[in-house]
Amino acid sequence: MVGVPLQWFLKDDFDGKEILWNLFRELVYYRELKADYAYYCNRVSFFEDAAQGMRRLMYEAVFSREARDEIRVRAFVQHYCHTEVASLFYLFDAVYAFHYVRNRAPYYTTPEGSALLASLYQKERGVYWEHTETALHLQFAYALAERVLFHDMPKGCNRACIARDPVVQEVLRTLVLGTEMSNFIHSEFFPLSGEVVPTKHRDRIVSVFLLEHFVRLWHLSVANITFELKNITDRSYDPFRNERAFEYTKSNLHAVHSRDGQQELKKREDVFESCTTQFDERFSISPKERKEFARLLRTTHRLRIDMRSFWKSLIGKSVQWIDCYEGKCPKGRLNVGDFVSVFPDFQEFRGRDQRYKLRVYDRVYEVRACTLRPAQIEVSFVVDNSGSMNKEKIASAREALAVSMLSLKDFGEYSDMLAAGRRERTTIHSEVYYFGSSFIKVKSFGKSKSKDFNSAQLIKASVNLDGRFGGTNDAEVLKHILADVERRRARVSSDTSFVKVVLVITDGCSSYPHESRRTIEELRRRGVMIFGFQIGLMSPEETALFHDVWNSTEELGLLLGERLEYLPRELLRTLRVVLSKVHRLSSGERLHAQRVW
């Protein structure tokens, strides 16, 4: 809601239709102010800079050298020049507002509406416009404004032109970038596309193309005028008359912008909260789960940002280019050997002015290298949910799981963005298993599911780890993954079209270590890259058993112990190494698990 004082129009004896027009015009000014309040706060400084040339000329042409340093003289000159220059910019603000309202209110394009605007124009013009001795610079400004205002008005509109000096008429005929001045201003202020032209851009147009003529004509007008200083002791060049009023206006502008910004932010927050609530209700995500996931996002934000930078660099480097050379081309780099061999023909072609038909040039160009990338990358997270997982271990595992899945999601999005420029497409998916005495899949790959469904599963898999599954039977879940890999290998066309990565997080040694070791070795023979991460304090016997399972032939297991805060970083570092190796894969090469720390 915008309030405009009605007495602004009553004192000018406007009727109802004219008041309505002026209300529309004031709303245009308000829209301009709201669109770029910061520029309006500093517009006075812009006018001061624009008036520098006029102030210099006034000092030189009007006042004696002895009087230039007087405070009264400086105040008068600054105020006078500021007022004159500002009037030019404010005039074309009014011109823009005039057209803005007219183009958006169909009534004012009709003959009746156009006649109303013409009569209102003459009423606002007043006696000042009819004065035959108007200063040259004001004749120029108002005459140009009139031409722009009535650029496309119907011929029936009655409009009177003020008397113009021949010098002014000559300036108005000046071409700007090969176009008549009024047509140029009209095209810049009112483009055919209908786009809104910001105040800053309009001020630049006026400053660059009109201000010079305005100041020159002003100089011709005041060259023979005698100025007298009367009652200007406390006069200021500030259009707000005093600093206090100016600061008050600026504070109001800042308050309006701050309020609008807060309202816009609150509106976005309300929309986001509404969408989040609908999402949670749709997929049965409790407020407790949402709160815990928000905590995980905050605590792992820095790690995720670092991984995004790494993914962008990795994917960018994965696109390889090779130089190709082509000879005997009509253009390019001259091949001296070819030129010597066809030199007799060259002389003949030269006489016929056909020498450019000779193919004696080499051309070098780049083509994208055809490299073989895996069509699918699958990452399985196997997380210990046994009773020995205490609060600290669960929190660390949740953070590691959340940031890893989110980072893989980011990697997949970046890879999809680049897919349009590559001959192959690589998709990446993740799944999550909780294991204890038995195991359960809490997140599937979701290849045929919607993005919302996959996001909901990611949230639940990140926050539902609670340590309620009893023992530590990791062998069973690893056998399940092995069986799935065997089925998958039978369906893929080659070993390099499918890459499988398994990351196991556990807080102790396996309940069935021998079965676990045999399954891990079998997975490695199948080309699966598998790694284990141990968290929590263990006895020497348990440590030896862990090494026997994971590091008997090759070091695939990492003992973190009580350094729980390192788990998210080490998990992400492993993903970095693995996916870096995947993107360096060439045709015919097979992936094998190897030590990454």
Curated annotation (Swiss-Prot):
CDD domains: vWFA. Gene3D superfamilies: von Willebrand factor, type A domain. PROSITE patterns: VWFA. Residues 378-575 form the VWFA domain. Transmembrane segments: none annotated. It comes from the Bacteria. InterPro entries: VWF_A (IPR002035), vWFA_dom_sf (IPR036465). This is Uncharacterized protein TP_0246. The lineage of its organism: Bacteria, Pseudomonadati, Spirochaetota, Spirochaetia, Spirochaetales.
